Amino acid sequence: MKLFVTDLDGTLVEYNNMTDENLEGIKKLNASGELLAVATGRAYNSCTFLKDKYGIKVDYLILLNGGLIIDKDGKVVHHKEISYNTVNSIIIDVKSDDSVISVETGYTSYVVYGRYKEDIDWDGLEYEDLENIKDKNLSLISLYYPKSDIDEVEKICRFINEKYSDEVVAYRNTCFIDVVPKGCSKGEGVNYVKERENIDTKDTYAIGDSYNDIPMFKEAGNSFTFETSEDGVKKEVKYIVNSVAEAIKNYCLK
């Protein structure tokens, strides 16, 4: 048995749109009987389009960068949380006029500071005051800095990792930062699935386009990214490809 793991945004889809090539590749993977996992910073409600729109069978959803894992039957098999006090403190520290901040429960995404652009379809987002959802199980903070340069966003990411190192880990993905509970990463999520399904590292394939994908590259014997990815990401993978479909057809199913 093989395990193919793909990042979602910027890798498998762009704004929930999948190319015909990638859809064909995923369908071939489904038909082969090999396992498919999607590893993303998104919550569950933002991933249902994979089945509803494209008819894809996903064996494992590794959500919130490893904070929540759901199997093909919709059963939660792994879940970690961030305390409300930590969430509130981080938001106070890093919010700015340029930021949009949302928090995730694993099933619902709440925008608690700023507003997303109206011309982008952000499925499943709700707008809510943080105080009103303090009793929810919060598992990820998503920080978006659309007008900041990469160096500035990286500086914010380092600040979070230094100040809150005992509680969380922050990963930068272009102008986004995902903050998850300590011990959570896409790599931990992939490792959990490997152990649960008794799959060897050499039979594990992982593809992504950003720094939060690097931990899962380390859990895969076969790792992939794109020529358009940042150099720091490209140096961590075994293969450079043009698409998810290419990684599936030329490597996983070869």
Tell what function each PLM region has.
Residues 37, 62, 205-207, 222-224, ...:
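Hydrophobic/aromatic beta-strand patches that form the interior of the parallel beta-sheet core
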Residues 2-16, 217:
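Asp-based phosphoryl-transfer active-site loop
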Residues 1, 33, 58, 98, ...:
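Short, well-ordered alpha-helix to beta-strand connector turns
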Residues 46-49, 189, 215-216, 232, ...:
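Phosphate- and divalent-cation-binding pockets in alpha/beta enzyme and binding domains
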Residues 97-100, 104-207, 211, 215-216, ...:
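Conserved acidic, metal-coordinating active-site core of Asp-based
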Residues 20-117:
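Active-site phosphate-binding/coordination module
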Residues 219-254:
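Asp-based, Mg2+/Mn2+-dependent phosphohydrolase catalytic module
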